């Protein structure tokens, strides 16, 4: 009997998972996307300023540009929640709750529909938020474990255990 977790995959959990991916395995891509968004934002603002410099109100194209910039800002600010929303839409029925048990040779995650066994070698990165441990299995797949439900050990014990088993540093993300 190893360390156990029970996790509900709700919007908060899915948002933490999206953030975990963005801050670990997608870090470089995320940085590029944010730089691209900033450049587009600056160019859009310069375009609006150039068209309104003569004292004329912005036309239809200026309003459309402004709305596009607003959508860009909102998508960038709320990207983790947006990704969580899409993930929730793709969540299979019966997988909203998972129970996981961590042993020496691997771990088992059970949902209402299936039970899956994983080896620690499958974990690409480990992140920790205030409430969750997030495992990145690829650039598109994660698992989250709610620290409030831990049994069979402490959070500190699990942090040391998973770092040893994966050979990966547990990244603290806020």
Describe each model-derived feature in a short phrase:
Residues 17, 111, 136-138:
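Residue-level recognition of conserved beta-strand positions in structured domain cores
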Residues 75-117:
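Conserved beta-hairpin
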Residues 132-174:
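A membrane-cytosol interface segment of integral membrane proteins
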Residues 107, 116-133:
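Phosphoinositide-dependent membrane-docking surfaces
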Residues 55-70:
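Hydrophobic alpha-helical transmembrane segments
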Residues 101-102, 128, 137:
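Generic beta-strand structural signal
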Residues 115-117, 124-126, 140-143, 151:
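Short, surface-exposed beta-strand-loop junctions and turns on beta-sheet-rich folds
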Residues 1-50:
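N-terminal membrane-targeting/pre-transmembrane regions
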């Amino acid at each position: 009997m190893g360390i156990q977790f029970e996790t509900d995959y709700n919007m908060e959990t899915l948002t933490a998972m999206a953030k975990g991916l963005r801050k670990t395995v997608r870090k470089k891509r995320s940085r590029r996307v944010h730089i691209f968004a900033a450049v587009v934002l600056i160019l859009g603002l310069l375009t609006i300023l150039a068209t309104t410099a003569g004292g004329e109100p912005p036309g239809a194209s200026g309003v459309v540009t402004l709305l596009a910039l607003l959508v860009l800002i909102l998508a960038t600010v709320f990207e983790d929640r947006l990704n969580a929303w899409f993930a929730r839409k793709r969540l299979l029925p019966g997988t909203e709750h998972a129970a996981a048990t961590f042993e020496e040779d691997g771990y088992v995650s059970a949902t209402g529909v299936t039970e899956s066994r994983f080896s620690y070698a499958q974990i690409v990165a480990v992140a920790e938020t205030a409430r969750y441990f997030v495992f990145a299995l690829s650039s598109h797949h994660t698992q989250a474990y709610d620290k409030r439900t831990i049994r069979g050990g402490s959070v500190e014990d699990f942090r040391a255990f998973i770092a040893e088993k994966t050979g990966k540093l547990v990244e603290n993300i806020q």
